[in-house]
């Protein structure tokens, strides 16, 4: 018999965005409204969601890649395979969100090289964050230096505004 721990639910409001946090068997997952926006936008473009979230285990490190209010999606379309790390950039400090996103992106990309090398990793960011923060000289330099692929999404229209490879 498996000893099942009860789920604990908590609701947090940050800058008007509601985040539902679910703790279950020692793992914490959180999901904000932008997860579903990106998922819908990908499906509108013909992508099939294959993993939600994408679980990766590399070298003794397990990544459920479902951190904070973000979630990693895996999708396929006509033989193409992608993974998408979704960020909302809702905190008052965009640079703090950026530091977290850069670290996660590098870790996830390295893990994918081990476990699923044909899958391309994209960082999904809202159109407002792209226009307000990601066009700055420093941010652009980091994106270019680390060869990030961006997926820019429109929260209101639930569409992908830009694929930047």
Give the label of every model feature segment.
Residues 98, 110-145, 153-155:
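Nucleic-acid nuclease catalytic cores
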Residues 3-15, 149-165:
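Charged phosphate-binding loop/patch that engages nucleotide di/tri-phosphates or the phosphate backbone
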Residues 82-84, 122, 149-151:
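Hydrophobic/aromatic beta-strand patches that form the interior of the parallel beta-sheet core
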Residues 86-98:
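Short beta-strand-loop-alpha-helix junction that forms the active-site gateway
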Residues 14, 18-59, 75:
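Acidic-basic catalytic patches of nuclease active cores, encompassing PD-(D/E)XK
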Residues 100-103:
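A general alpha-helical scaffold signature found inside nucleotide-binding enzyme cores
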Residues 48-82, 97, 164:
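Active-site metal-binding core of divalent-cation-utilizing nuclease and nuclease-like domains
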């Amino acid at each position: 018999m498996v000893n099942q721990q009860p789920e604990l639910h908590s609701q947090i409001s940050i800058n008007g965005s509601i985040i539902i946090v679910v703790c279950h068997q020692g793992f914490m997952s959180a999901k904000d409204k932008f997860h579903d926006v990106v998922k819908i936008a990908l499906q509108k473009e013909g992508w099939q969601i294959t993993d939600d979230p994408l679980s990766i285990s590399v070298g003794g490190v397990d990544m459920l890649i479902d951190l904070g209010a973000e979630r990693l999606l895996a999708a396929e379309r006509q033989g193409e395979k992608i993974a998408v790390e979704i960020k909302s950039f809702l905190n008052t400090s965009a640079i703090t969100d950026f530091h977290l996103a850069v670290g996660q992106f590098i870790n996830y990309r390295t893990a994918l090289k081990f476990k699923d090398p044909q899958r391309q990793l994209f960082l999904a960011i809202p159109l407002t964050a792209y226009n307000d923060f990601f066009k700055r000289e420093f941010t652009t330099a980091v994106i270019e230096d680390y060869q990030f692929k961006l997926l820019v999404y429109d929260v209101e229209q639930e569409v992908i505004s830009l694929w930047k490879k």
